Protein backbone atom coordinates (compact mmCIF):
# COMPACT_ATOMS: atom_id res chain seq x y z
CA UNK A 1 0.00 0.00 0.00
CA UNK A 2 2.83 2.41 0.82
CA UNK A 3 4.48 1.61 -2.51
CA UNK A 4 1.29 2.42 -4.38
CA UNK A 5 0.90 5.72 -2.52
CA UNK A 6 4.52 6.69 -3.19
CA UNK A 7 4.12 5.84 -6.88
CA UNK A 8 1.01 8.03 -7.12
CA UNK A 9 2.79 10.97 -5.46
CA UNK A 10 5.78 10.69 -7.82
CA UNK A 11 3.55 10.44 -10.90
CA UNK A 12 1.56 13.49 -9.78
CA UNK A 13 4.72 15.58 -9.44
CA UNK A 14 6.00 14.46 -12.85
CA UNK A 15 2.68 15.10 -14.59
CA UNK A 16 2.20 18.56 -13.06
CA UNK A 17 5.48 19.73 -14.59
CA UNK A 18 6.22 22.06 -11.69
CA UNK A 19 8.47 24.97 -12.56
CA UNK A 20 7.88 24.89 -16.32
CA UNK A 21 10.43 26.80 -18.35
CA UNK A 22 10.42 27.60 -22.05
CA UNK A 23 13.03 26.12 -24.40
CA UNK A 24 14.05 27.99 -27.58
CA UNK A 25 16.51 27.54 -30.41
CA UNK A 26 19.57 29.77 -30.13
CA UNK A 27 22.53 30.90 -32.21
CA UNK A 28 24.69 29.56 -33.65
CA UNK A 29 22.97 26.22 -33.06
CA UNK A 30 21.42 24.22 -30.29
CA UNK A 31 18.77 25.03 -27.73
CA UNK A 32 18.58 27.01 -24.52
CA UNK A 33 16.34 27.01 -21.47
CA UNK A 34 14.93 30.49 -21.00
CA UNK A 35 15.08 32.40 -17.74
CA UNK A 36 11.88 32.63 -15.73
CA UNK A 37 10.99 36.15 -16.99
CA UNK A 38 11.68 35.25 -20.65
CA UNK A 39 8.33 33.95 -21.87
CA UNK A 40 8.83 34.05 -25.65
CA UNK A 41 11.17 32.73 -28.31
CA UNK A 42 12.24 35.06 -31.11
CA UNK A 43 13.78 34.86 -34.56
CA UNK A 44 15.25 37.96 -36.15
CA UNK A 45 16.35 38.03 -39.78
CA UNK A 46 19.25 40.39 -40.51
CA UNK A 47 20.63 41.18 -43.96
CA UNK A 48 24.38 41.79 -43.88
CA UNK A 49 26.23 44.26 -46.08
CA UNK A 50 27.23 41.36 -48.36
CA UNK A 51 23.54 40.44 -48.87
CA UNK A 52 23.87 37.40 -46.69
CA UNK A 53 21.04 36.40 -44.36
CA UNK A 54 21.77 36.05 -40.66
CA UNK A 55 19.18 34.44 -38.37
CA UNK A 56 19.33 35.47 -34.71
CA UNK A 57 17.37 33.26 -32.30
CA UNK A 58 16.86 33.07 -28.57
CA UNK A 59 14.65 33.91 -25.58
CA UNK A 60 13.03 37.26 -24.84
CA UNK A 61 10.72 38.84 -22.31
CA UNK A 62 8.96 41.00 -24.91
CA UNK A 63 8.66 40.80 -28.67
CA UNK A 64 10.46 43.66 -30.43
CA UNK A 65 8.42 45.44 -33.07
CA UNK A 66 9.38 45.89 -36.69
CA UNK A 67 9.86 43.85 -39.82
CA UNK A 68 11.79 40.60 -40.08
CA UNK A 69 10.96 39.58 -36.50
CA UNK A 70 8.87 36.67 -35.25
CA UNK A 71 7.97 35.71 -31.70
CA UNK A 72 6.18 32.68 -30.28
CA UNK A 73 5.55 31.11 -26.89
CA UNK A 74 5.83 27.33 -27.19
CA UNK A 75 8.89 25.11 -26.88
CA UNK A 76 11.24 25.20 -29.89
CA UNK A 77 8.83 27.30 -31.96
CA UNK A 78 11.48 29.66 -33.39
CA UNK A 79 12.94 27.21 -35.89
UniProtKB/Swiss-Prot annotation:
Tissue expression from the record: Expressed by the venom gland.
MF GO annotations: toxin activity
Disulfide-linked positions: 24-41, 34-59, 63-71, 72-77
Signal peptide range in chain numbering: 1-23
Assigned GO CC terms: extracellular region
Keyword Repeat among UniProt keywords: no
Keywords of the record: Disulfide bond, Secreted, Signal, Toxin
Annotated compartments: Secreted
Sequence similarity: Belongs to the three-finger toxin family. Short-chain subfamily.
Protein's UniProt name: Short neurotoxin 3
